[in-house]
Amino acid sequence: MSGKLFIILLLLVTPGEARKSFLRFLNIQNPEMLSFTKPEETVIVRSSYEGKRPHSSYLLVKLEDPTVLQVVNVTKTSLDFTDFTINLKTFPGETNLTMQLWESEGRQTRLIEEITNIRVSVFRQTEDSLFQEPIHVNSSVFLLVLLMILLNKCAFGCKIELQVLQTVWKRPLPILLGAVTQFFLMPFCGFLLSQILGLSKAQAFGFVMTCTCPGGGGGYLFALLLEGDVTLAILMACTSTSLALIMMPVNSYLYSCLLGLAGVFHVPVLKIVSTLLFILTPVSIGIVIKHRMPKKAVCLERVVQPLSLTLMLVGVYLAFRMGLVFLRMANLEVFLLGLLVPVLGFSFGYSFAKVYLLPLPVCKTVAIESGMLNSFLALAIIQLSFPQSKAYEASVAPFTVAMCSSCEMLLLLLVYKAKKRPLLSTENEKAPLV
């Protein structure tokens, strides 16, 4: 029965359709997406089609928007293969093009192959371009910073007590509060405030994506420096990054529809997964060291604070260096929203934790994890989601939030340490002399 069915299906397919289905003659480097930056560009398409007569095939290029692309000419060269060279004039914007391979047989023409919906993005690198002034980092320095980050995360793992970890899992209220704040309240507030302040669609989406990002690596650093619950901070960071696998695509789709930008974005799930693994792996190694080699764990715990401060300063320096270009595009409304986003996260997290009468270290941690967002993950999503001409405008949001949240946390840390010092000196004076 199956053999007869297969023969019937073959009889229903004409030879021309069979050739078109199973044979591909045109070869282009990236048939889904082409990116251009120069006023004049060249695309080479290779054809492996051998016609009945030599030089009988030709390439036809159809443009969806002639204000973005214009075909100057198409030249053909034939050696072992046939190469079609398409010379184009480009203008900033986005469009689609279609390539058709035709064969002429006397007065008749026959379509051999067609490639449709080739996405083309054209942008210009101006003096405000991110790549105009690249940051040159020596490979040895980069490797040193990477090793410091891994060592720092491993040292944080050494500070985790399994008993505390089990307690947190049995009472997951702080994690739930952080998740609700990060993935529901913050994106909505980012969307609402961006509409109130009248930001462009690209900037509004940039703020929404920044607000829906999970807590960044700086959360448990400040939890340590502000005497919060470090174990809870690390657990919240891991949990929120895991939830982001679902919530970031959902929020991306929802708010892009509300902004009228549906169908434009691609959320890099692998980037989120790699971030999660980057947090989990060295932290897990630190937990193992804590219980297998407690003496070495004590040594690692001693370097947590100085190493964390060093990495924080390096991060602030790099953020300012990279963000200066983006900040030239920022206006007063963008700066205002960049200042408000972290404050809202801190306020929501701390208020919810206080309402449920959680201990003070837990309240601090929930507030920090709700306000310290992984803005650079939002930047990566924007760079992959937008055409380059719009990516710079949208990237203003995560850089502004990253720098504002870092400055606000540093200011809070200085105030906290300044208030704590008189209290310590007063306690020392009251202590009885032996």
UniProtKB/Swiss-Prot annotation:
InterPro entries: BilAc:Na_symport/Acr3, Bilac:Na_transpt, Na+/solute_symporter_sf. Residues 1-18 form the signal peptide. Glycans are attached at N73, N96. The keyword Ion transport applies. Residues 151-172, 217-232, 290-306, 353-365, 417-434 are cytoplasmic. GO terms for cellular component: membrane. Belongs to the bile acid:sodium symporter (BASS) (TC 2.A.28) family. This is Sodium/bile acid cotransporter 5. It comes from Rattus norvegicus (Rat). The gene is Slc10a5.
